[in-house]
């Protein structure tokens, strides 16, 4: 399950002193209690509840905050902290979302397990149980490290140690100078495009299409140079 995530950093200028932030008619109040960080905001039932903020990811230019829900669900608040301008802001300021919609922060659209972890952690196993609508998400490393792009490193290190200058890639080391452009796109695009994942987890086997369904290029989703339009 989710663990060893970066805790709220007291060295950053973050206001959890009772401030209220309002966007699209929703008021979120951030405060501290019993050495914990909390937010009072609208929940999945349309009522206001107190939620304990237990994890954060990102440092600059922004931080997002995570709340733990039942059954292993981790939800990302829609309100984030601008650590450059020292202010709260809405990730989608012009977009009204009703509490019953999938895009509400407490539902699927901002669910860390399914929407964030695959590209922001290494070797993620979502471990979703459809019958109980629960997660037992696991990962090797909480952030993106070398193995997220280059694959498991143990065999590579063992081979280099054993062979020295005689080392040749046995196929366990991904994304090298020998990687063909099409293969490189397969391995990079999974986190640098708009797509949906339909495999249980990414394991460097097969092609990108064995794991993901990409969105077709159009001017509503991408900039002319190919960057994602956010």
Predicted region positions:
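A common structural microfeature
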Residues: 27, 36, 62, 74-76, ...
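C-terminal substrate/ligand-recognition segments
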Residues: 111-126
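A short, surface-exposed interaction/processing loop segment used at functional sites
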Residues: 75-109
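Primarily the internal scaffold of c-type cytochrome electron-transfer domains
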Residues: 1-56, 64-69, 90-102, 123-230
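N-terminal accessory interaction module
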Residues: 56-83
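Short, flexible loop/turn elements at secondary-structure junctions
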Residues: 81-83, 120, 192
């Amino acid at each position: 399950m989710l663990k060893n995530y970066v805790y709220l950093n007291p060295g950053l200028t973050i206001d959890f002193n009772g401030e209220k932030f309002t966007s699209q008619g929703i008021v979120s109040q951030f405060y501290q209690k019993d050495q914990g960080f909390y937010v009072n905001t609208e929940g999945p039932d349309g009522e206001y509840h107190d939620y304990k903020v237990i994890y954060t990811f990102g440092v600059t230019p922004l931080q997002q905050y995570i709340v733990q829900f039942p059954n292993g669900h981790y939800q990302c608040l829609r309100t984030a902290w601008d650590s450059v301008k020292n202010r709260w802001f809405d990730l989608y300021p012009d977009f009204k979302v009703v509490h019953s919609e999938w895009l509400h922060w407490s539902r699927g659209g901002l669910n860390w397990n399914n929407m964030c972890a695959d590209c922001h952690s290494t070797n993620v196993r979502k471990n979703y149980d459809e019958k109980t609508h629960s997660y037992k998400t696991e990962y090797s490393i909480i952030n993106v490290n070398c193995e997220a792009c280059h694959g498991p490193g143990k065999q590579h290190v063992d081979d280099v140690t054993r062979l020295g200058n005689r080392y040749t890639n046995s196929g366990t080391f991904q994304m090298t100078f020998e990687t063909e452009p099409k293969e490189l796109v397969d391995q990079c695009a999974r986190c640098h495009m708009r797509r949906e994942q339909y495999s249980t987890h990414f394991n460097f086997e097969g092609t990108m299409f064995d794991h993901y369904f990409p969105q077709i290029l159009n001017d509503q989703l991408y900039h002319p140079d190919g960057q994602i339009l956010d």
